[in-house]
Amino acid sequence: MDSLTSILTPIHREGHRFAIIFAAVTIVLFLIWNPLGWIGVILTLWCLYFFRDPDRVTPTREGLVVSPADGIVNLITEASPPEELGLGDMVRTRVSIFMNVFNCHVNRAPVAGTVKRVAYRPGLFLNADLDKASDANERNSLLIERADGEQIVVVQIAGLVARRIVCDVREGHDLAAGERFGIIRFGSRLDVYLPVGAIPLVAVGQTAIAGETVLADSISVLPQV
């Protein structure tokens, strides 16, 4: 049953037109030459796989910050949030998750809260695995405020192949932890700026699963009584 469920996983709506195009081209290729058609079948299946949008089980305990993306934790550094959010120069711990073309590219909210600001900034399309991609590449930043007033920043960053950032939320939108808020095509990166003082619970090289992997526990930074 689990295997059947994985095969029948729905795709994100951003993939619908691509699936139609790939399928149409496949039909034409079959008409031209049968072996070419089978190549088209493989590419169509890859398209469906790329845009897959599986359900996730998100931990619900207060204070947890979950991964917004599937991929590999490739950087954990200290940095200031994007200047377009207007948060000043206060340094936070930044956890970067790199998505290759085989990862699920649907992005999910790292915490429950209200979107206070959405800021898009055009830029380059460097390899998203590079540290400087955070500053140089095209990006879309979200400032999310939890009910307790704590603010978390998540940044969608375009990559060498990714040329399309999709964000489905606007300022004032209330998000649940793990809720889908966007997607990036094809291969990219997400940065999460943790609450001040929060200690990351992941390590560089670790595999992260969107909406499930816990990046940090901000409650643990509160002073003990």
UniProtKB/Swiss-Prot annotation:
<protein>
    <recommendedName>
        <fullName>Phosphatidylserine decarboxylase proenzyme</fullName>
        <ecNumber>4.1.1.65</ecNumber>
    </recommendedName>
</protein>
<keyword id="KW-0210">Decarboxylase</keyword>
<dbReference type="Pfam" id="PF02666">
    <property type="entry name" value="PS_Dcarbxylase"/>
</dbReference>
<comment type="subunit">
    <text>Heterodimer of a large membrane-associated beta subunit and a small pyruvoyl-containing alpha subunit.</text>
</comment>
<keyword id="KW-0443">Lipid metabolism</keyword>
<feature type="active site" description="Schiff-base intermediate with substrate; via pyruvic acid">
    <location>
        <position position="188"/>
    </location>
</feature>
<keyword id="KW-0456">Lyase</keyword>
<keyword id="KW-0670">Pyruvate</keyword>
<dbReference type="GO" id="GO:0005886">
    <property type="term" value="C:plasma membrane"/>
</dbReference>
<comment type="pathway">
    <text>Phospholipid metabolism; phosphatidylethanolamine biosynthesis; phosphatidylethanolamine from CDP-diacylglycerol: step 2/2.</text>
</comment>
<dbReference type="GO" id="GO:0004609">
    <property type="term" value="F:phosphatidylserine decarboxylase activity"/>
</dbReference>
<comment type="function">
    <text>Catalyzes the formation of phosphatidylethanolamine (PtdEtn) from phosphatidylserine (PtdSer).</text>
</comment>
<keyword id="KW-1208">Phospholipid metabolism</keyword>
<dbReference type="GO" id="GO:0006646">
    <property type="term" value="P:phosphatidylethanolamine biosynthetic process"/>
</dbReference>
<keyword id="KW-0594">Phospholipid biosynthesis</keyword>
<dbReference type="InterPro" id="IPR003817">
    <property type="entry name" value="PS_Dcarbxylase"/>
</dbReference>
<feature type="modified residue" description="Pyruvic acid (Ser); by autocatalysis">
    <location>
        <position position="188"/>
    </location>
</feature>
<keyword id="KW-0865">Zymogen</keyword>
<keyword id="KW-0444">Lipid biosynthesis</keyword>
<dbReference type="InterPro" id="IPR033175">
    <property type="entry name" value="PSD-A"/>
</dbReference>
<comment type="similarity">
    <text>Belongs to the phosphatidylserine decarboxylase family. PSD-A subfamily.</text>
</comment>
<keyword id="KW-0472">Membrane</keyword>
<feature type="site" description="Cleavage (non-hydrolytic); by autocatalysis">
    <location>
        <begin position="187"/>
        <end position="188"/>
    </location>
</feature>
<keyword id="KW-1003">Cell membrane</keyword>
